[in-house]
């Protein structure tokens, strides 16, 4: 029996956060930057503009973009993949009148976790670990030498 974990058209991604964990305020900063930069949406995360507007180095700018895309706060514009727009989820949570602009409610954090763990193409590691690994604990040995169960489970 073949054990399928990803669809045929899934594009796996195992990097992009530049080794930076998601930090408090990053999603709001990314949301506001994309929302307020409608004249040139491709410039928001460019090296010069990103460093200036976010006040961080270029690797952190890339990480902020990664986390905002991974959680679904922003999305690439269809015809211009290097340009971004805010999503309905981003508006619902992070807008001035949104439900939790600073992501302080535990429910918002759980939603972010669910988005990370449920999207295989951008968040392949989280998807794999939280959906296909039966381990009760997380330790380096278990995941360094990861093997699939002999039979699929639901």
Give residue ranges: language-model regions.
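Short, amphipathic alpha-helical interface elements at domain boundaries
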Residues: 1-129
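A short acidic, leucine-rich amphipathic alpha-helix
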Residues: 50, 139-146
